[in-house]
Amino acid sequence: MSAGAITIGLDFGSDSVRALAVDCQSGKELETDVVYYPRWREGKYCQPANNQFRHHPLDYIESLEQAIKVVVSRLTNDQRQSIIGIGVDSTGSTPAPIDEQGQILALRPEFANNPNAMFVLWKDHTAIEEADAINALCRSGQFPDYTRYIGGVYSSEWFWAKILHVSREDAAVRQAAVSWIELCDWVPALLSGTQAPADIRRGRCSAGHKSLWHPSWCGLPPKDFLHALDPCLTETLQYPLFTDTWTAEQPVGSITAEWAQRLGIPETVTLAGGAFDCHVGTVGAGAQPYTLVKVIGTSTCDILIADEERIADRTIAGICGQVDGSVVPNYIGLEAGQSAFGDMYAWFGRLLGWSLQEAAKDHPELKTSLQAMEAKLLERLTHNWAENPTLDHLPIVLDWFNGRRTPFANQRLKGVITDLNLGTDAPTLFGGFIAATAFGARAIMECFEEQGVPVENVLALGGIARKSPVIMQVCTDVMNRPLQIVASDQCCALGAAIFAAVAAGVHGDIPTAQQHMASGIERTLMPDSQRVARYQQLYERYQQWCRLAEPAYSPTSTAKN
């Protein structure tokens, strides 16, 4: 091991990028910085009412540069010279179109303000019809079912659906793009100066979970499948977009001299391969096989790794993919998740906060006080409900406010609130929201277990997991499992730093690096036996409402409405 070696993990989230410097020997988190995307904060290029969420590539470039420079500036000179690697994770699927030089189209003047030329954020659901078309073709019998290793359902949140939607909608982008790239693959390519689309290393994680890549059909689906889906996919796009994939501990190259100078780090820094945030966060959390890791934020991503021998040739239905090496080499990475978790709470806060916002407009002198009240709304709701957590009249809420990711992805679904009466107050309704997110978490756990994939432990990480013990206790009671809370609140960036340590040769493999660098457990929550029984009844009612409500959002039903 290199004495004093330091790696930097870059974690690209929905709102911001985090840079974290980690000591590769002790695992000590040395310095960190978070930078919010400026254009995103202004709401540019997004239309929430139409489910359109886009990120301009300059938001990523400017923010990563600022974050790393701040982190590096806080290190000693010796520490700066000891930086030997950078690892990258990002949200996903978050792809963007690129030209022959590997440049994101939005970085060209003629596309600078075109949302279709930017990164299509994971939670963008403009491609629902395109996802339906992919699913229909996979089930038509004309081709093998290319969805069988991704749970049997292709989502509008994923790679090909988004490519197809933009290609159909925007002829200029369609003609200019020769390929598309995931954010987690683009950042290492950018920093290492890899430009030609054919030379860019594509990560196993993103390719296997979102791009229909699988060894059994030698990579991506064949060209005739894409042509049958829509000829626009074969007009100008290179085929195949890529063939080989790499696990994230593999190096993709060294940082360019220009970027090393801009960031103030050595030119010898190695770039690790990219992967999705939650898969990388699982490594940062130190997870072992058959531990269900819940990465909880605006949404959740649930990751479990399993032995290749145990999964064998079985396919696990209703999840978001089973990919060899997507988390740790030589293990199958299984992905699931909820399309909204913290976003549901935030929506409820905005709903109640509307009157405060209006009052601030009418009384500017009270604006600061009213904004402070609004910022405390969810905290007070949670505290109030926790003091009197009645379950006798708890509303049943379906956690589909941003569609459903697992089990069985369906982004047509909408949130549902039931069992209200004239006595339902705001804290009680918020309690229903908390229970709904916990019910969704249990449905994911059962999706694994009912198909013979054991869940031996449950870990939770992220801001909500560490800062909201009330919410986590509800999850514990609903799932009727001990719930371990991971100590680090930046596990994704930590995991990226772990991958960088292996890529740079500091550690020989991921398990060894985890022993030195992974986070510990902060505390373990235990189920309350009395509340477990009552939540069981409520969960059964939640499942009943799920069965009743889902048909109302079928394509034929929504068309009639």
Swiss-Prot record:
Please give the catalytic activity noted in the UniProt record: D-ribulose + ATP = D-ribulose 5-phosphate + ADP + H(+); L-ribulose + ATP = L-ribulose 5-phosphate + ADP + H(+)
Tell me which domain of life the UniProt entry assigns to the organism this sequence originates from.
Bacteria
Record's keyword terms, sorted: Arabinose catabolism, ATP-binding, Carbohydrate metabolism, Kinase, Nucleotide-binding, Transferase
Q: Which Pfam families match?
A: FGGY_C
One GO MF annotation is:
D-ribulokinase activity
Q: Which GO terms describe its biological process?
A: L-arabinose catabolic process to xylulose 5-phosphate
Please provide, in alphabetical order, the Gene Ontology terms of the cellular component aspect for this entry: cytoplasm
Q: Does the keyword Nucleotide-binding apply?
A: yes
Q: Which family does it belong to?
A: Belongs to the ribulokinase family.
Protein's name according to its UniProt entry: Ribulokinase
